[in-house]
Swiss-Prot record:
This is tRNA-2-methylthio-N(6)-dimethylallyladenosine synthase. Binds 2 [4Fe-4S] clusters. One cluster is coordinated with 3 cysteines and an exchangeable S-adenosyl-L-methionine. Residues 484-493 have a biased composition (Polar residues). It is found in: Cytoplasm. Its cofactor is [4Fe-4S] cluster. It holds the Pfam family TRAM. GO terms for cellular component: cytosol.
Length: 510
C-alpha cells in the first residue's frame, strides 16, 4: 500500500497518530425507531465505508445519533495501520461493555459491532477477548450487515471476515438526497480497493485483499447522485487508487484513473476532483498529463515515498529508488507547475542507519512538501518487516521522528506563508466558526475562513489570503469577474475553467 493517510491539513503528527477518529451522528427522523452510532478510525476509505453502513441500515429503521449512550446499535469501524491499533479497539470495547451492561439493566438492549481492518485481522480473537461484542465483520463483507444483524438477534457472537466472490458494491444502497446534502458539498467515492504491492511494513493486502476496481458506469452513477444532491467536489479514493483498472462500457475499452477522471470532470455541476492515495510505481504518463489537461483536477497530490534511502526502500519492497521518485516529481511539476505535494514517511524501519535517515532528510529538502504524514515504524504482525532481527531502538526512532517532523513543519509553514497576499479559488463548504463567516478549502486542501453569505456555500469564489495560521487561513472574499453565482451554488463551467487555468499559472514556492 502507498500509505493511505491523506488529510486536508495535518495539524501535527500527534493528530495524524489519532487516526482521524470520526464520530458520525445526526438528528433522528421521527420515522425511525432505532438509533445507530458509528465511530470510524483511519483513512478516507473508512469514512466512506461508515457512510455506506449508515445508508445500508437506514431502510432497517436505524437513524444516526452522535451519542453512544442513545444508540441501539454501536459500530466501531476500525483501522489496523498504526501501532497498537488492536489494543486501542479493545480499550474502546471495554468502555462499551460497561455501557451495554448499564443499558441492559435499564431494559434497553444494545448490539456492538466491530467492523473494518482490525475486525478482518483479529476475527474470532475479538469475541474471545470481549464477550460484549455481538458481531465482527470485515471491510469486504459489511454489505451483509442487515442480514447479519438479524442473525445475531438469535445467535450473538458471529464473525464474517470472508472475501466474498460477489462485489459488495452491487449490494450497497444509494444514500437519500437529504443525507447527501447533510454530509456537505464534498464527498469521497471509492473507485478501487485492496493492494497488490505487499510493502513489508503494511497489513493492507492482508486486510483489504487484492486490488479490485469498480466499473466506470457504477462510479459515474454514484457521482451523478451526489451532484444532484449538492456535492461539488469528489475525491476518488482507493488503497492504491492510481492502480485503477476498470472497464468503460461506453468505449468498450479498459479505463485508467486518468480516463475515469476525464469522464467525471465532464459531468455538469461538478467543480472539483481529487484522488488519493497513490503509489509512485503506478503514476503513469497519462495520469501526469491529467494534471495538466483537466482543469477541475486540483493541484494537490499525496504521493507517499516512505524513505529517501535506496537500501531501506528495497527492504520495504517499494520497488522504486529515491532517484525514481525525484524524476517522477520533476515530471509532475513540469506538467503542473503550481502543484503542491504531500507524502508519507516512516522512520526507524529495521536496518535504518543514520546515513539512511540523512538520505530521507535530503530527499525532503530537495522536493519541498506542502504537508506530510510521518510515523515511527511499528511492527505489524504477519508482515515481513515485523520478523526482521535488526529492529531499531525506540529512543532512536523517536529522535529521528522529531528531527524529520521539524523539517516537514518548517516546509509546511513556508508553503502556507507564501500564500499570503495571493488570490486563490476557494470552494465554500459550510458556515464558519463565527456569525457572518463561511468556511471552505483552497485548491491545496487548506481550511479557509472568510466573512461571507451562506448562500455562497457550494460555490467557488476568489479569496485574497490575509493570514496563514498553523492549520487554516483567513481571507477576504473578492467580487467575481466571471459572473454572479446563483443562490443554489451553480457555477458556469467556463468560469471555473478560467479560474483554475489562472491558478495553474501561479508559481507556488516551497
Amino acid at each position: 500500500m502507498s500509505g493511505f493517510n491523506d488529510s486536508p491539513v495535518p495539524e501535527s503528527a500527534e493528530k495524524a497518530d489519532g487516526l482521524l477518529s470520526q464520530e458520525r451522528g445526526t438528528q433522528d427522523p421521527l420515522v425511525n425507531t432505532r438509533k445507530l452510532f458509528v465511530k470510524s478510525y483511519g483513512c478516507q476509505m473508512n469514512v466512506y465505508d461508515a457512510e455506506r453502513m449508515a445508508d445500508l441500515l437506514a431502510p432497517e429503521g436505524y437513524a444516526e445519533t452522535s451519542a453512544p449512550e442513545d444508540a441501539d446499535l454501536v459500530i466501531l469501524n476500525t483501522c489496523h495501520i498504526r501501532e497498537h491499533a488492536a489494543e486501542k479497539v479493545f480499550s474502546e470495547l471495554g468502555k462499551l461493555r460497561l455501557l451495554k451492561a448499564e443499558q441492559q439493566a435499564a431494559g434497553r438492549p444494545v448490539k456492538i459491532v466491530v467492523a473494518g481492518c482490525v475486525a478482518q485481522a483479529e476475527g474470532e480473537e475479538i469475541l474471545r477477548r470481549q464477550k460484549a461484542v455481538d458481531l465482527v465483520v470485515g471491510p469486504q463483507s459489511y454489505h451483509r450487515l442487515p442480514d447479519l444483524l438479524r442473525r445475531v438477534a438469535h445467535t450473538p457472537g458471529l464473525v464474517d471476515t470472508e472475501f466474498p466472490a460477489e462485489d459488495k458494491f452491487d449490494h450497497l444502497v444509494a444514500p437519500q438526497p437529504e443525507k447527501i446534502a447533510e454530509r456537505g458539498v464534498g464527498a469521497f467515492v471509492t473507485v478501487q480497493e485492496g493492494c497488490d504491492k505487499f510493502c513489508s511494513f503494511c497489513v493492507v493486502p492482508y486486510t483489504r485483499g487484492a486490488e479490485t476496481s469498480r466499473p466506470v458506469e457504477a462510479i459515474l452513477a454514484e457521482v451523478e447522485t451526489l451532484i444532484a444532491s449538492g456535492v461539488r467536489e469528489v475525491t476518488l479514493i482507493g488503497q492504491n487508487v492510481n492502480a485503477y483498472h476498470g472497464f468503460d462500457a461506453m468505449t468498450g475499452a479498459p479505463a485508467s484513473l486518468a480516463s475515469l477522471m476525464a469522464r467525471v470532470a465532464a459531468m455538469p455541476g461538478l467543480l472539483r476532483i481529487r484522488y488519493t492515495t497513490s503509489h509512485p510505481n503506478d503514476m503513469g504518463e497519462d495520469l501526469i498529463a491529467a494534471h495538466r489537461d483537466i482543469p477541475a483536477l486540483m493541484p494537490f497530490l499525496h504521493l507517499p515515498v516512505q524513505s529517501g534511502s535506496d537500501k531501506i526502500l528495497a527492504a520495504m519492497n517499494r520497488r522504486h529508488k529515491a532517484g525514481d521518485y525525484l524524476e517522477l516529481i520533476a515530471s509532475i511539476r513540469a506538467a503542473r507547475p503550481d502543484i503542491a505535494l504531500s507524502s508519507d514517511f516512516i522512520v526507524g524501519f529495521p536496518g535504518e542507519t543514520e546515513a539512511d535517515f540523512e538520505a530521507t532528510l535530503a530527499l525532503i529538502e530537495q522536493v519541498g512538501f506542502a504537508s506530510a504524514f510521518s510515523f515511527k515504524y511499528s511492527q505489524r504482525p504477519g508482515t515481513p518487516g515485523a520478523d526482521r532481527p535488526d529492529q531499531i531502538d525506540e529512543d532512536v526512532k523517536a529522535q529521528r521522528l522529531a528531527r524529520l517532523q521539524a523539517l516537514l513543519e518548517e516546509q509546511r509553514q513556508a508553503f502556507n506563508k507564501a500564500m499570503i497576499g495571493r488570490v486563490l479559488p476557494v470552494l465554500f463548504e459550510k458556515p464558519g466558526r463565527h456569525p457572518g463567516q463561511i468556511a471552505g478549502k483552497t485548491p491545496y486542501l487548506q481550511a479557509l475562513y472568510a466573512e461571507g453569505d451562506k448562500a455562497l456555500i457550494g460555490t467557488v469564489q476568489p479569496v485574497e489570503i490575509l493570514e496563514a495560521g498553523p492549520n487554516s487561513f483567513h481571507g477576504r472574499l473578492l467580487a467575481r469577474e466571471t459572473g454572479q453565482e446563483s443562490a443554489q451554488g451553480q457555477e458556469s463551467a467556463q468560469g471555473m475553467e478560467r479560474m483554475e487555468q489562472n491558478a495553474r499559472a501561479w508559481e507556488v514556492p516551497v
